[in-house]
Structure formats: structure tokens, C-alpha cells
């Protein structure tokens, strides 16, 4: 796996050198470095993470309206420690930029900020507002369902997942995140296994959780 991620970063590094004004290429390079950081040792992961941040920042500099790049940089700032260039103040500033481009995404970003600060009531309000603004976007429902599950409100979470599955019956993301929620909560494990098996038979995109992650989750659901 590490070899695959190295090939990806090497190829994308060449791509940005040939197309230095491409915001999207820098975005993809940042994602590749991020995946490489996740799979790396504790000694090399910080270096890879820093390269991911630099690529995301460059992508946003090149195109201030590249919402995917802004979102990825927001997530980096939200989750990374300060010594790696993260920080809630930086994330909050980016959330305001997101608001200028997409109101639903803005409320999702605000929800994550409040959740990070353990202000769960405010976070829920923003998650629900994001759903109201984009009722046909299945991702907004998944976000709300995952949040509710994390709060221990499993029945409410399952009802929202059911709503998402009716909206997009064959969505791989719904299958995966619903199954993962069941496994994390230790409930409906038989159903989780069926969902994961369907997921593994689906046509996945690079934006979907990896097959390896789904297989690992399936083994966990079976007690392995």
C-alpha cells in the first residue's frame, strides 16, 4: 500500500511541475500525501502531512473558488495539531470563505467546528440546517446520521440513514457509513455485514472509502 501511495505522490508531483497553475492537480497531490501520511510510520507521517497541507494551501491560493480544495484544507486545519500547521482559528476563517460559495457546505463546516469544541447542541443545529439547504444531497444526511450515532442516539441515527438509503438506494457511501456506525455501536452486526458485502460489490470511486477499509470493518463485525 505504501508503494502505491508513493507512486501516486511521485506521479502527481510531476503533474504539478508540468502544470504549476492547476489548482486541481495540487488538490490531488495534497490528498495523495494525506493518504501516504495515514499509512506511514510515526517518524515520517508528520513530514508527509506537512506536504499535504502545503499542497492544499497552494491549491486554494491558485483558485479561491475551488470548494473541494478549501474543504480539504479546512479539514486539515480542523484535525491537525498546531505544530503541523493546524488550528481551529484557521479552520474558522476558512469556514467563512466556504459560506461565500455554498451555504450548505458552510453549515456543515460550522457543525464540525462546534463538534470539535464539544458544543454539540450548536453542532446539531448546523448539521440539520445543512440538510434543510441541500435535502437531495445524500452526504448531508450521512453527516447528520453519523453525528447522532456519535452522541449515542442510535435510533435517531438509523432513521436518518434509512432516509438516506431511500434517497439513494445504491449509494456506496450510505452502505459503508451505515455499516460502520453499526459496528462502532456493536449493534445490528448481521445487517452491517450485509451492507459491507454489498459495498464491496459496488463500483467504487476514489472518493469512496477504500475496499481495504471495508474489508477490515467486515472482519471486525465478524469478531475477527
Please give the residue ranges for each predicted region.
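TPR-repeat structural position
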Residues: 5, 39, 49, 88, ...
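Register position in tetratricopeptide repeats
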Residues: 1, 35, 39-42, 79-80, ...
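Canonical positions in the second alpha-helix
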Residues: 14-15, 58-59, 95-98, 129-130, ...
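Short coil turns that delineate tetratricopeptide repeat
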Residues: 20, 64, 100-103, 135, ...
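Helix-start (N-cap) detector for alpha-helical repeat units in TPR-like alpha-solenoids
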Residues: 23-24, 67-68, 103-106, 138-139, ...
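Terminal, low-structured helical/coil segments at or just beyond the last alpha-helical repeat
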Residues: 86-89, 97-117, 181-224
